[in-house]
């Protein structure tokens, strides 16, 4: 997922998690990371953490928010609004992906301010019948197994996802099935991530190629097999820091120094292609890809890209809106 889609999904799922929110006492970020490691199923191949309170303080956040709300997102926002959801109550989010899952098929945990009693009463007023999930009541916003449901776990903590995924999450959280903490890669990657950034995440296996597929959607006439390009990448760690500009930083651990050197060459080539595509689509505008830095150290490849908010909006317009 690229920076623009990351912000869009963080906003969307911030609203979704807001279903859970309304008493003080949010858990700190490290506790949310622990929840993800102990509560996500082992099929998870990517995690993304965000701090919506920081994101709401971004320059032009209101403009960004309005620009990236497509029809499908508006529909979900309307549904959640029926429960009296307030997006500003959210404090932290962690999202999970499984192989083959799409943007709207995400799941995760949310922290903030919430009242289970208020949600129960609001749901009852709208004749929303709770569905038991691992012994806890879940309120589903859409019909069917794939619809999004929410569960209040305790003060300031809730979970969301499909009924099937929620069941796995709660069972993992209770120790009934293995959780993501049993995969040694994820605790190590989370420990080494830049947790000060308002958005940061880790990915392994096919999730690495999927992340780049979204981040570099336009390669001009160059057609790439992303799966092959990142076949020798074991893991990805990324962060999005925001201030006067937006800075994307990432590190990829490769299987060998040789595979890392080859990957760096590919990324340098993509940098040139992206520069030309940008200049063609946005003549006379500052080109963020000219400042993209690709580094190499042993078997690790790093990348850093800084862009202004106006360039970020231009990139979003060129890529089109995701519904």
Question: Where in this protein do the model-derived segments appear?
Answer:
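Structural boundary/hinge residues at secondary-structure and domain interfaces
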Residues: 29-146, 187-228, 265-295, 300-302, ...
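Structural motif
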Residues: 153-154, 242, 297
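A conserved glycine-rich beta-strand in the N-terminal activation segment of trypsin-fold
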Residues: 148-212
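Bacterial N-terminal signal peptides that target proteins for export
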Residues: 2-14
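Solvent-exposed, non-transmembrane alpha-helical starts
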Residues: 120, 168-170, 260-261
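A contiguous, surface-oriented mixed alpha/beta subdomain in the mid-to-C-terminal portion of proteins
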Residues: 206-264
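Hydrophobic lipid-interacting interfaces of membrane-associated proteins
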Residues: 162-164, 255-257, 299-301, 308
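Bacterial N-terminal signal peptides
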Residues: 13-22
């Amino acid at each position: 997922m690229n920076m623009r889609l990351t912000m869009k999904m963080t906003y969307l799922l911030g609203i979704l998690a807001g279903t859970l929110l309304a008493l003080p006492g949010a858990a700190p970020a490290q506790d949310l990371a622990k929840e993800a490691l102990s509560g996500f199923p082992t099929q998870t191949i990517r995690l993304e953490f965000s701090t919506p309170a920081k994101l709401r303080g971004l320059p032009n956040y209101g403009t960004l928010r309005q620009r990236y709300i497509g029809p499908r997102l508006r529909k979900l926002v309307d549904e959640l609004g029926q429960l009296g959801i307030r997006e500003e109550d959210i404090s932290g989010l962690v999202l999970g992906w499984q192989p083959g899952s799409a943007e709207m098929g995400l799941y995760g945990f949310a922290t903030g301010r919430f009242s289970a009693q208020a949600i129960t009463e609001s749901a009852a007023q709208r004749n929303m019948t709770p569905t038991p999930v691992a012994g806890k009541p879940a309120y589903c916003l859409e019909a069917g197994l794939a619809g999004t449901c929410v569960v209040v776990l305790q003060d300031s903590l809730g979970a969301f996802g499909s009924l099937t995924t929620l069941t796995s999450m709660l069972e993992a959280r209770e120790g009934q099935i293995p959780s993501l903490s049993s995969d040694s890669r994820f605790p190590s990657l989370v420990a080494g991530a830049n947790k000060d950034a308002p958005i940061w995440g880790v990915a392994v296996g096919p999730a690495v190629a999927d992340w780049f597929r979204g981040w570099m959607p336009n390669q001009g006439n160059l057609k790439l097999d992303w799966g092959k390009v990142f076949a020798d990448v074991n893991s990805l760690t990324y962060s999005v820091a925001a201030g006067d500009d937006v800075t994307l930083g990432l590190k990829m651990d490769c299987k060998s120094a040789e595979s890392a050197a080859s990957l760096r060459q590919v990324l340098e080539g993509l940098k040139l292609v992206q520069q030309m595509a940008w200049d063609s689509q946005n003549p006379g505008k500052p080109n963020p890809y000219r400042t993209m830095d690709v580094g190499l150290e042993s078997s690790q490849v790093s990348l850093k890209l800084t862009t202004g908010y106006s360039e970020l909006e231009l990139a979003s317009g060129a890529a089109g809106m995701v519904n």
